[in-house]
Each structure stands twice: as structure tokens, then as C-alpha cells.
A protein has these predicted regions:
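PLP-dependent aminotransferase-like
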Residues: 88-146
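PLP-dependent enzyme catalytic core of the Aspartate aminotransferase-like
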Residues: 160, 308-309, 318-349
Length: 349
């Protein structure tokens, strides 16, 4: 079985018998917040009961956090679970995604026999989404996926352009799905979210606790949409107890971790330009992304050479629109980033 995502720490341990310095997964470098860990431990006595299938308490708290009605929220077993539920609920015949972007959109779409069209972003424009994307949206395209910021490029789509894309989708009878799982790492995230457009009706926003709160192993995400009938269909399309009681407890605790979130945002804002400068000083081409990860170009053999030295990047060779020699690295703590740069310097000598 071949895995196509980063974060395969278990595979590395099985191969090398040790843990790696993992830059392949874009999660908080500060780890699980202490308050969340305590909440999971405190919830263990409830593990003998079925979890609330509707996540009532968590959705109520998310409604206050996001400023949307409770009925416009659906929780799932990570954002990936919600992507599949959405596709299974709608069963689109034709869909549009950018290239490069997160692979699970196409994987989910193809699981229902959907024809996936790729809009190839231009390398000379640093893979930015431009208004040319609107022209690719036409009647017969049932669903459009946009990642904000895009994974793996880190590029943001300007909110006025996002609104233009949404209106084009509405005119064509198309559902727009905006993946904001990495957006909350930005201090100015409120300036880039599509939440203010939810009233349009043909919009679904995907979010996750996974990345910002370092909860990848807990699995917890949620969808926002004014189309409550669609959310009910998504609820019915998966297993009835999709979010464990421990994950619900973790989510409730995470929403109290405001100081932790500010610390993570400050760390990424400080370290991203430093890591960018360090990579460029080694002669590597680095995109000016805004996310908690960076896309850069190097030799095709770089990734494996680093693996042998105990550090793992996300090879982007399997991303349509990229190819061999493209890599994504997470932005981690200062000492970890310095260790990566040191290992890179050794490999590039």
C-alpha cells in the first residue's frame, strides 16, 4: 500500500528503526496544547458510551467561535471525512480543481465516478489563482474546490476574487467548496476567510482542528454552510458516530486555547521569513507563500538524501502541476528549522 500524503512517521520508523525530524506534515510545531491533553484524559471514563452523533455541545461552542448559527455547522472525523461526505452527498458528475492542490479532492470525486477537470496554475505567476480561473467555471461543472491558502503553494486567493468565483459558480449552478484548514495560522485570517459569503447558499467552507492545534491524531474537522439540507445529507452519508467522544472533548478544550493560538501564529510569522531566507541562501527557489509551509524547488534526489540523514520533506512529485524536484516543508520551531538548513547544506555541498 502506497501513501500519498506527508506525516508518515510510522513508515519512516518501520524503515529506519528511529523517528525522523518531520517537516512533511503541516501541523502546529508546538504540539498538542496541554489543556487539550488534559481534556482527553478527563474524557476517558466516557469511552464506554457512544459519542453524541450530532456533536451538539461542540457545534454550539463552534457557533459562538465562528459567528454562525449552530445548524450551519457539521462536525466530522477530520476535514478529509467531510470532503468525502460532501462528494457522496452531492455525487457531482463533473468538478473543477486547481493544479497543484490537495489530492483528496480528486480522490473523493473519483470515488463517485466524477470527471475531474484540472485548471493548471501558471508557474510564472507563482501558481496564484487569478481571474482566469472564473472562465473555467461553466454550466455542467457541478462542484469547484479551492484551498485557501492553497496546499502546497501557500498562495492566498484575494477575497474579491473569491467573491467573483462564488458568483460565477452561482450563475452556473455550481457548488463552491473552500478549504480553510490552514487559514487560521495567519494573524490576519479574518481578512481572507469566505465566511462573510456564506449567505450566498452555494458555498461550503471546510475547517479543521488538526493543523492549528496539533491534533492530527485526534481527527476533528467541521464544515460551514447555509445549505442546511446539504449538511443533513452529508451527516447521513457516513457512519453515524463519526466523531469520537474524546475528539469532541478535545475540540471543546481547544476552543479555549486562545493564548496557544496566538503563540503559534507569532511563531510561524517569525520563522517563515527566516526559513525562506535560509533556503534561498542555499540557492533554492522558494515561493512567497503565506501559510505555515513553504514550496521550494531543488534536485530530484534531495528528498531521499535528507531521509537518510533523518529529516523528511513532502515530495511534491505526485502533485499534478508540479513534478520531481518540488518539495514542501513545514515551518517549525527555530531550532528545528536551523537543523533542516544544516542538513540541507550538507546535502547540497
Amino acid at each position: 500500500m502506497q501513501l500519498v500524503h506527508g506525516g508518515d512517521w510510522a513508515g519512516y520508523r518501520a524503515e529506519f528503526g528511529r523517528d525522523a525530524l518531520d517537516f512533511s506534515a503541516n501541523v502546529s510545531p508546538l504540539g498538542l496544547p496541554e489543556g487539550v491533553a488534559r481534556a482527553i484524559t478527563a474524557a476517558l471514563p466516557t469511552a464506554d458510551r457512544y459519542p453524541d452523533p450530532l456533536c451538539r455541545e461542540l457545534r454550539a461552542k463552534l457557533a459562538l467561535h465562528e459567528g454562525v448559527p449552530t445548524e450551519q455547522i457539521l462536525c466530522g472525523n477530520g476535514a478529509a471525512d467531510l470532503i468525502f461526505r460532501l462528494v457522496w452527498a452531492r455525487k457531482p458528475r463533473r468538478a473543477l480543481v486547481t493544479a497543484p492542490t490537495f489530492a483528496e479532492y480528486a480522490t473523493a470525486l473519483e470515488s463517485v465516478g466524477c470527471t475531474v477537470e484540472r485548471f493548471f496554475l501558471r508557474e510564472q505567476e507563482d501558481f496564484a489563482v487569478t481571474d482566469a480561473f472564473c472562465a473555467a467555471i461553466r454550466p455542467g461543472v457541478d462542484m469547484v474546490f479551492l484551498c485557501q491558502p492553497n496546499n502546497p503553494t501557500g498562495q492566498l486567493t484575494a477575497l474579491p476574487l473569491m467573491e467573483q468565483i462564488l458568483h460565477r459558480c452561482a450563475a452556473c449552478g455550481t457548488l463552491l467548496v473552500v478549504d480553510e484548514c490552514f487559514l487560521d495560522f495567519l494573524p490576519d485570517h479574518a481578512l481572507h476567510t469566505a465566511k462573510g459569503l456564506l449567505g450566498e447558499g452555494n458555498l461550503v467552507i471546510l475547517k479543521a482542528f488538526t493543523k492549528l492545534y496539533g491534533m492530527a491524531g485526534v481527527r476533528l474537522g467541521y464544515a460551514l454552510s447555509a445549505d442546511t439540507a446539504l449538511l443533513e445529507q452529508m451527516q447521513a452519508c457516513g457512519q453515524p458516530w463519526g466523531v469520537s467522544s474524546l475528539a469532541q472533548a478535545a475540540g471543546l478544550a481547544a476552543l479555549e486555547e486562545t493564548a496557544y493560538v496566538e503563540k503559534v501564529r507569532a511563531l510561524i510569522a517569525e520563522q517563515r521569513p527566516r526559513l525562506t531566507a535560509g533556503l534561498r541562501a542555499l540557492g533554492l527557489r522558494v515561493l512567497d507563500g503565506r501559510a505555515n509551509y513553504l514550496l521550494f524547488q531543488a534536485s530530484e534526489t534531495l528528498g531521499e538524501a535528507l531521509r537518510q540523514r533523518g529529516a523528511v520533506l513532502r515530495s511534491c512529485a505526485n502533485y499534478p502541476g508540479l513534478g520531481p524536484g518540488w518539495y514542501r516543508t513545514a515551518v517549525r520551531t527555530g531550532p528545528e528549522n536551523e537543523q533542516l538548513l544544516k542538513l540541507l547544506a550538507e546535502v547540497l555541498e
